[in-house]
Design a protein with these regions (language model features):
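Structural recognition of the beta-strand scaffold that forms the well-ordered cores
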Residues: 21-26, 60-66, 97-102, 132-136, ...
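Active-site beta->alpha N-cap acidic-glycine motif
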Residues: 1-66, 169-172
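Alpha-helical scaffold elements within enzyme catalytic domains, especially in hydrolases
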Residues: 14, 90, 154-155
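Alpha-helical scaffold elements lining the catalytic groove of polysaccharide deacetylases
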Residues: 30-56, 72-131, 144-147
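Residues within well-ordered alpha-helices
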Residues: 11, 86-87, 152
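C-terminal domain-boundary segment and adjacent tail
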Residues: 141-173
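Glycine-/small-residue-rich active-site loops that bind phosphorylated ligands and cofactors
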Residues: 3-4, 71, 141
């Protein structure tokens, strides 16, 4: 949510230069605002693109992750039962991909888990899966995620996993 991280926006340029992929998420991450309607969601994405445009080619970004994921139920509270289905269809109509995770670090569930707990959560949730998209958070309340990351990367590498960008793993048609 860029609204909370304005001072870090210049790091986007560095991330792209290092070969990382930028995907869209949300400008505000306020469920009650963004999931009011389809128009409200796309207004939030437009604001996000406006904020990141000085640092990356925002118009070329074709991947996004819905706040709460594509099957979230919180959106029903604000925009009705069919909103997520509508938004997913609209993303696809634009020729974009929406991306969900299949491994959750559980680093934002509250209680400030330790780096060791986050590591164990990722290893446990990975199980026997061969293709993983791991959900992790980078915020003031999830500082231990960064501490856990080197061990998580090492574990995946030691277990034969290859690291790809989302675009490499899920190419657009």
């Amino acid at each position: 949510a860029t609204g909370y991280n304005e001072k870090y926006l210049p790091l986007l340029t560095e991330a792209v230069s290092a070969g990382h992929q930028i995907a869209l998420h949300s400008a505000s991450h306020e469920y009650s605002d963004i999931y009011r309607s389809s128009d409200a969601y796309w207004e939030d994405i437009a604001l996000l693109k406006e904020r990141i445009a000085p640092y990356v080619d925002a118009e070329s970004i074709r991947y996004l992750r819905f706040p709460g994921g594509s099957t979230n139920t919180v959106s029903r509270r604000y925009g009705g039962k069919g909103l997520m289905k509508q938004l997913k269809a609209e993303v696809e109509q634009k020729g974009w991909h929406w991306v969900d995770w299949n491994v959750c670090a559980e680093d934002a569930v509250g209680g400030h888990p330790s780096a060791g707990t986050i590591y164990r959560n990722v290893v446990h949730e990975t199980g026997q899966q061969t293709n993983c998209i791991v959900l992790m958070h980078d915020s003031a309340t999830t500082r231990t995620t960064a501490e856990a990351l080197p061990d998580i990367i090492r574990w995946y590498a030691d277990n034969g996993y290859t690291f790809l960008t989302v675009a490499e793993a899920l190419p657009l048609n």
